[in-house]
Amino acid sequence: MARISGIDLPKEKRVEIGLTYIYGIGLPTSQEILKATGVNPDTRVKDLSEEEVNAIRDYVNKNVKVEGDLRREIKLNIKRLVEIGSYRGIRHRRNLPVRGQKTKTNARTRKGPKRAIGGKKKK
């Protein structure tokens, strides 16, 4: 079984697709890794030789930021934005959309469920 960056790759899938199970590796990065290591993208993960797995593992460790390191970097970037008080940091702090979307009617995913506001009761 191929284990790269602490992730077990699915045995039955093609290597090109199997690598995308690692956080931080999408299809373009996966293709780049396979081209650099000389592994055929159509090979199934279960058919990889130990040398091919080691070549992929070494390339990923040296050239691609994945899993915990990538998550940590993203978290630190957001923390930095919040600390310096930038517009994006303020949006993160208030749990509002960061990338300029309208919020008058939508943005329910980011804002959470509606909260009822108690109004004046008419007699």
From Swiss-Prot:
| Any GO BP | translation
Query: What does it do?
Result: Located at the top of the head of the 30S subunit, it contacts several helices of the 16S rRNA. In the 70S ribosome it contacts the 23S rRNA (bridge B1a) and protein L5 of the 50S subunit (bridge B1b), connecting the 2 subunits; these bridges are implicated in subunit movement. Contacts the tRNAs in the A and P-sites.
Where is the segment annotated Disordered?
Answer: 93-123
Subunit structure as annotated in this protein's UniProt entry: Part of the 30S ribosomal subunit. Forms a loose heterodimer with protein S19. Forms two bridges to the 50S subunit in the 70S ribosome.
> Which SUPFAM superfamilies would you find in this protein's record?
S13-like H2TH domain
Give a yes or no for keyword tRNA-binding in this entry: yes
- Gene name, Swiss-Prot/TrEMBL: rpsM
Family to which this protein belongs: Belongs to the universal ribosomal protein uS13 family.
- Which InterPro entries does this UniProt record tie to the protein? Rbsml_uS13_C, Ribosomal_uS13, Ribosomal_uS13-like_H2TH, Ribosomal_uS13_bac-type, Ribosomal_uS13_CS
**Gene3D superfamilies named in the record:** 1.10.8.50, 30s ribosomal protein s13, domain 2
Keywords from the UniProt entry:
Ribonucleoprotein, Ribosomal protein, RNA-binding, rRNA-binding, tRNA-binding
> Would you name any one GO CC term?
cytosol
Q: What is this protein called?
A: Small ribosomal subunit protein uS13
Q: Name one GO molecular function term.
A: structural constituent of ribosome
